[in-house]
Amino acid sequence: MDQLRIGAGGAAAGATGPASREGANAFANPTLTTAVRFLLEDLAVRIPGNSVEVRVPLFGAVQCVPGPDHRRGTPPNVVEMSAQTWLALALGEETVEQALAEGRLLASGTRALEFAAVLPLVR
């Protein structure tokens, strides 16, 4: 794993992936942090299970989608995105397909995108 350096703006230098563009400054807004975590928990309640892990780095992660339980190591189905992307999906401002096409959502595993069946969470 590459080592990351935190820059003056709070962003991790050399980081890759959807969350790396966001930086740690997002924690300066407690409303954003609360919204992201609340909506992640809401996702886990609406589609309970352990088959897919939805990650919003620096904010939280939940396991959801019924199916085979995952107990150790990296789950076979993982989705990762920034806080802004997660909020846009949860609020119905964009689709999973849009976020994937624009590289703001990373997904691995054959069932990774099954979490999208309950989106948007807020109607």
Listing of model-derived features with the role each one plays in the protein:
Residues M1-R123:
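Feature captures hydrophobic
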